[in-house]
Amino acid sequence: GEYCHLNVYNRSELVTDPGIRCDWALALAPTWDNMYKTPGVLGGSIWSGIDDIFQMPNGDAVGYGPWGPIDGWRRPKPEYWDMKKIYSPVRVTTEALSPANELVIDLENRYTYTNLDELRITWTYGEEKGTAFADLEPGEKGQLRIRLAHPEKANELYLSFADPRGFTADEYLI
C-alpha cells in the first residue's frame, strides 16, 4: 500500500511554512524502521520518484504532479536527502565518540544480499584519513574499528560508505 506521501497537497501551507517539508521525515523514519523489523514486509516505494507532467492523448502536456523527491528538472528536493538517509542500507548507531587510540563505531548492515566487506569505507578524523573494513553479513550488527595516531587532534569523525559501483550508500559525521 501507499504510505508517507510528500507534503504537496496543501500548496498554500507550503508557501507560508516551507519548513513543513522537514516534518515529512518525522513520519517516514519510524514507519520505515517498523517495516524493516517486521517479518514478511518486503518494503515500500515512493509514489513518484520524479515530478510528473501529464501527456494527453492528443500529445499536449498538461498539469504538474509535484509528488516526487526529485523535481521535473532532476534536482533533489529537500525531502530527497531525508529519504536517502532513512532508506540507507548502512546504519551507524554510535552517536558520540570518546577520543582514544582506537575508535569503535557500532554498525548495522541493512542490505539484503550484500556483506559490508564489499563496500569501500573511508574515514577522516582531523588530519588523519584512511580506509576501514567491516565484515558484516546482511542483517548483522557489529563494530567498525579505526586506529588513530593522534586522537587528541580532532573531535569529529567523517565516514563514507560506497558500494562496489562507487555510489555513496551513506555518509556520517559523528
Regions found by a protein language model. Name each.
Residues 37-38, 149-151:
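Alpha-helix C-cap/termination motif
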Residues 102-135, 142-147, 153-164:
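Beta-strand-rich binding/interaction modules
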Residues 1-106, 110-117, 126-128:
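Extended substrate-binding grooves/exosites of carbohydrate-active enzymes
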Residues 54, 88-89, 139-141, 165-166:
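Glycine-centered secondary-structure boundary/capping sites
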Residues 166-174:
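Edge beta-strands of extracellular beta-sandwich domains
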